[in-house]
């Protein structure tokens, strides 16, 4: 019982990270109907920017954890947002009216470019970092097994829920959110009605990239190690989470992330850890067969 509870806590934490990344996927898809396959690598870039910022602040003598994290969050999210804007301008906007596969191929090219840029500039070796938020709460101790809830896990869960609440409010209550929903329903009609669709799409990429950077910072603080390849695996799993939860739905993205995180962690705990990725990706196949619109997704209505 205690062991299962610990895995539940670990799975929820990992799922929240996947959910943060998945929100970026689902926002972009909801507006332009395309998957940003460079999004996972922006998450990776955000993790490296966070590491660079934390090391730089430490070298300047700024070691107060709250201040260092706040400055790092602004730095990483700001630069990652710039990367997201660049991806939209370079890989998507020029090819928006082209055949459907053109932006996809272009985004994959941007993904490979980001991976190789980080590999060349930061090296291929794993980058470690010591824990900034140690300690936690011991929930129970049974059969010589202590169930621990770390402060970092609590921070990840709270951050994800706050982000979900803020962006749900953004999409439903603000002029930008109304523009996003109008573009999602009919991009050309939104443009005819006076909405700056190019600006709305660019801001969507910028917001999604900033969220990916937040997830990158959470990943760095939680696991303490990163490399240039983490964006690919995490990105594919977050995409799986977005599809499972219902792509286009913000709560669905987080719900899908939770399910993928729980499946991965429980599989690693009770079965062979070598097949945890197989188990996670198998869920995508099952979801596409039996629930093609996802758990909270809406069936598309084809206009005639």
Language model: regions and residue ranges:
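Glycine-rich helix-loop "coupling/hinge" segments at transmembrane-helix boundaries
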Residues: 40-42, 223-250, 256, 280, ...
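Hydrophobic core segments of alpha-helical transmembrane domains in multi-pass membrane transport
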Residues: 47-52, 73-83, 108-118, 157-168, ...
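Inter-helical junctions in multi-pass inner-membrane proteins, predominant
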Residues: 1-17, 170-177, 201-242, 265-278
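Single transmembrane alpha-helix segments in multi-pass membrane proteins
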Residues: 4-55, 86-102, 244-250
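Membrane-interfacial amphipathic/re-entrant helices at transmembrane-helix boundaries
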Residues: 1-22, 49, 60-72, 98-102, ...
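Transmembrane helix-bundle core of multi-pass membrane transporters
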Residues: 94-95, 103-173, 200, 266-271, ...
């Amino acid at each position: 019982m205690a062991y299962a509870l610990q895995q539940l806590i670990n799975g929820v934490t990992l799922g929240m990270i996947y959910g943060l990344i998945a929100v970026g996927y689902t926002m972009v898809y909801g507006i332009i109907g395309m998957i940003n396959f460079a999004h996972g690598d922006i998450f990776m870039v955000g993790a490296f920017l966070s590491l660079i910022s934390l090391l730089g602040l430490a070298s300047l003598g700024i070691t107060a954890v709250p201040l260092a994290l706040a400055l790092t969050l602004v730095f990483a999210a700001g630069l990652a947002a710039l990367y997201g804007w660049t991806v939209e301008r370079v890989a998507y906007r020029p090819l928006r009216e082209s055949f459907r596969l053109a932006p996809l191929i272009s985004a994959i090219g941007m993904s490979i470019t980001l991976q190789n840029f980080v590999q060349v500039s930061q090296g291929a070796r794993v980058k470690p970092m010591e824990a900034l938020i140690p300690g936690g709460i011991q929930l129970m101790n049974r059969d010589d097994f202590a169930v621990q809830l770390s402060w970092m896990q609590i921070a990840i869960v709270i951050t994800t829920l706050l982000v979900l609440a803020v962006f749900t409010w953004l999409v439903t209550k603000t002029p930008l959110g109304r523009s996003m929903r109008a573009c999602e329903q009919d991009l050309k009609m939104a443009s005819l009605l006076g909405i700056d669709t190019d600006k709305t799409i660019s801001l969507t990429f910028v917001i999604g990239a900033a969220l990916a950077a937040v997830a990158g910072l959470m990943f760095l603080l939680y696991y303490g190690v990163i490399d240039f390849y983490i964006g690919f695996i995490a990105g594919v799993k977050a995409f799986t989470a977005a599809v499972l939860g219902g792509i286009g739905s913000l709560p669905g993205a987080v719900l899908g992330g939770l399910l993928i995180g729980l499946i991965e962690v429980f599989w690693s705990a009770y079965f062979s850890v070598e097949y945890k990725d197989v188990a996670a990706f198998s869920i995508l196949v099952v979801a596409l067969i039996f629930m093609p619109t996802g758990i909270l997704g809406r069936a598309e209505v084809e206009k005639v």
